[in-house]
Each structure stands twice: as C-alpha cells, then as structure tokens.
Amino acid sequence: MFTGIIEEMGTILEVAKGTHSAVLTIAAGKVLEDVNIGDSIAVNGVCLTVTSFDGETFTADVMHETLNRSSLAQCKRKSPVNLERAMPANGRFGGHIVAGHVDATGQIAGRKQDDNAIWIRVEAPPEVLRYVVEKGSITIDGISLTVAAVTAHDFSVSMIPHTAEVTTLGSKKEGDIVNLETDIIGKYVEKLLHPQEEKKETHITQAFLEKYGF
C-alpha cells in the first residue's frame, strides 16, 4: 500500500520489451536506501516488484495487464518517473490509501496558472469518473491530489508549486497521458450497497432445496 506522497523522481535507463511484457531499469536514489528483492515500489502510480538492484538502479517486470491499463507502455529511455516505496507500518499517512493498481489512463485536457496554484483538467473514462467526487482524493501518476471539480467528462485538481517541482506532473502538458487510480473506499462502498450485481446466476433455488430434502 502507498499514500501518494512521491519520495523522488527517478529516470528510466532501459526498457526491454517482450511480446506482451517489459522490463524496466530505473535510476533512483532515496527509494534504494533500504530496498530488498521483492519489495514494492510505485512507478508513476503502478505497483511494481523489485527483481534486482544495485546502489543506483533497480529493475522491475511489467506484465501485459499493466501495460494495457497504464501509461508505462509509452515509457522511453530518459523518461522521468515518480517513485514511492510501500508504506511501512509505522509510517505517516500523508496522502490517502493508494493500492498502486491503476484503473485507467486519462488525458490532460487543460492546464492554467492561477497565482501560485496550477490547475489541471483531466479527461477520464466513465469507469473512473463514477468514483470521482468533489473534495475527494484521486491519484494521478502516483500523486495524491484533491479533486476540485467534476463534470460528466473530466475532473480538475489544483497543484501547489512544491508538487509541481518534485513530481513529473510539473512538466506535463495538454494532451499528455497520465495514470489514474480512484479512491478504493468508494469501490468497496459500491459493492456493499449493490452486492447482488456481483453474484452470478445460480440454479440452487428454494424449490430445488426442498425437492432434495433440505
């Protein structure tokens, strides 16, 4: 689990693409301080498992489903990425609950400066927008942000200068693709309120049970 508070920006050094997967080698610093094989690191909001590392880089596999659902398929050498280690049990919860499981990608549809605030508008698919609420939390490329406004086709967030300086979102422009993860609490609430929609049709009815002596 992560919190959406980016620890540092890393740089992709190598992208080894397979038929339906890829292996990323990423240059980093802070996130390598206590890393071990098998640890989770969020890369632009995508939870990846460390498969090897040295003092300056780490390597992680990216599976077919992740490539299809996230922007990692577009990553190239020298691309900057947001990095966050999994939250320790005694860590501070600075953002919100982030699973590192990207729901879909969105596209930056607008960006404007308002005094010291940077407003970003993101177009998102319906399956994402259904869980986006005003004043709620949204993860954009691994960054925990507060939703300022929502429409039928997009949502807006306001970014402070510090976030722009220490994350990749500061250099994003209109038309760029970003990873989106909605607040998982909303998904659980929906399932609790509508449990029948998740159940598959069954042939075991009351009449069936009575017929066989139950």
Protein language model regions, located:
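Conserved loop->alpha-helix
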Residues: 1-214
